[in-house]
Amino acid sequence: MNKCSIAITGAAGNIAYSLIFRILSGSIFMPDTKIDLRLLDIPDTKKILHGIKLEIEDCAFNSLDTITVTDKPDVAFADCDYILLVGAKPRSKGMQRSDLILDNAHIFSDQGKIINKVSKKSVKIIVVGNPANTNALIVCSNTPDIPNENISSLMRLDQNRAKSILSSKVGQHVSSVTKLVVWGNHSTTQYPDISHAQINNSNNFLDTIDEHWIHNDFIPRVQKRGAEIIEHRGLSSAASAASAVYDHFN
């Protein structure tokens, strides 16, 4: 039997709630891998975390070995194999991701220092909390003993959004879209690039799409999709973000 430890910050939040059950479904790791799950959030969420713990127990996941609920980062991160830094101040209506930098910088700085002190030096870290790319850099700056290549920020949500919009445009299933790239930051300055994309292993679809749609519809829609969801839902992306973390992890 193999074991691995996974810590999730912001564990009482909507993204983590959607993510936890996908991870424990057992499809990421080998079937004989047992997960030591650590759920971390602020003290005010203690009651919520306990409720989530009860739900997890009720699922009777074969993949789950142990579960720890804590508000202490050093407990959550101790000897960890994987850390998902989901917890951060969320973006609300009218805010850009850059507005979150000052509010979240100290969170990721402090967590980085603790990770560097107590986690395995081989730990793999995925930064989800926005602005994810900046927060990942902050974590890197505070984890000198952990290789930079072990730390990544979430861009898969933008790629998934781009694939979905493109597949809808050409009338093909999203699984047929490959080699689509999103350059830049997880922000409105990102550049979804379909110049090398393929649909069913062919780039012939490019002949059916005009430049006006690419530059005036496709790219802005991907760039502003997060704001569009907030406008309609009143909250930032949760289930789609969790699904993207799962894809990134997988």
Can you say where each PLM-predicted feature lies in the sequence?
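N-terminal Rossmann NAD(P)H-binding glycine-rich loop of SDR-like oxidoreductase domains
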Residues: 8-12, 20
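Residues forming the Rossmann-fold NAD(P)(H) cofactor-binding site
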Residues: 17
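Conserved N-terminal Rossmann-fold NAD(P) cofactor-binding segment
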Residues: 25-80
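Conserved NAD(P)H cofactor-binding loop of Rossmann-fold oxidoreductase domains
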Residues: 87-89
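Rossmann-like NAD(P)(H) cofactor-binding subdomain of soluble oxidoreductases
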Residues: 96-165
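C-terminal substrate-binding/catalytic lobe of Rossmann-fold NAD(P)-dependent dehydrogenases
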Residues: 143-152, 157-250
